[in-house]
């Protein structure tokens, strides 16, 4: 009788553990994701964020939610690496390429999620800027393609969609600096500053009060000699709340630009 009770209790406990384990497993991964996000977005500790996401990867391998975050952390780390020597530049590029690898894996795992294409576009965009956008036309075209795909999917929330429009705008703005006949030979004839301005505005509509969006739109207006709208954007940079690690530097730059163009 006691033996039967023991067996029944053991089976009940085992069943409880079997059903509870996936919940605990899922909660642990989500807790690590939340912790990593906090390191990135609040504490601005990119290395600790990366380490935390790799902890999540050990628990949940091949998880697209983890992979795109690893990519994001690598981009942030690379952005802040010194590039004052050839060896330093090589090391920086290697980190950007790691970011691209994990973003690409995220796309393969979740091809219907806009954020995966956005993170791949961001990693490729950084590589293109690093190498020189007119030396890697195919990479620039892939940035545009991934932004278009993220926008077409339309998911991920306003911030993801705003970033997709912003990156598409910035790509148009940067590429359009080169003489169109010359860049057309590289397959980059599509770039247009007016399109960039339109897409910057879409990004702002989706996610207002973000300093980076206002700053780049202000710069685009300056290229059009529209100093009235440019001043408005730079003043909005100053008035907007801090949401990103680089926001303080944008305020400093905006104040300097406003002083420079005050009589224009």
Specify the residue positions occupied by each region the protein language model found.
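TPR alpha-solenoid repeat register
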Residues: 66, 116, 160-164, 213, ...
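Terminal, low-structured helical/coil segments at or just beyond the last alpha-helical repeat
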Residues: 29-30, 159-162, 182, 236-264
